[in-house]
Design a protein with these regions (language model features):
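Short, hydrophobic/aromatic-rich segments at coil-to-beta transitions
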Residues: 41-43, 73-78, 99
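Structural motif
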Residues: 61-62, 76
């Protein structure tokens, strides 16, 4: 599937409450690829599987955009390789501990121990969350 990269951006605040009829629209050009992928050589896309990050707005089947050039900070959402297995979690950096936190109460905090092999693969920058039930071109589900 080919997506048009240049599209029109209608600049206006969108009220979630009562709309203001006096608000005017401005039209600008927006290159979606430049917005979401400022560093193409270090940007990767992942299809999310599972529900451990729903509290962060990341749902099963979403498209996660990840930049490998960014430095992970405390509370960054990261792609991590933990003992060779890939996962998406929130990075928790404390004075003497490193942990990977899920954003769902059914998933425990993973405290990193010296016996664990942790590699921070990249930092999540955007999530594309479909608002319709139509199949997405990146979906892993049939």
């Amino acid at each position: 599937m080919t997506w048009p990269l240049d599209t029109r951006l209608l600049v206006r605040r969108i009220d979630a409450g009562f709309p203001s009829p006096a608000e005017e629209w401005r039209e600008l050009e927006l290159n979606v690829h430049e917005l979401l992928v400022p560093r193409p050589a270090s940007t990767f896309f992942f299809c999310v599987s599972g529900s451990s990050m729903v509290g962060a707005g990341i749902h099963d089947g979403d498209l996660l955009i990840v930049d490998r050039m960014l430095t992970a900070q405390h509370n960054s959402i990261i792609i991590a390789l933990l003992d060779g297995k890939a996962t998406v979690k929130r990075l928790q950096l404390r004075a003497r501990t490193i942990a990977l936190k899920a954003e769902h109460p059914d998933y425990p905090l993973i405290k990193i121990t010296p016996r664990m092999a942790l590699q921070i693969w990249g930092v999540a920058t955007y999530v594309v969350h479909p608002l319709t039930s139509a199949p997405q071109p990146w979906s892993l589900h049939p």
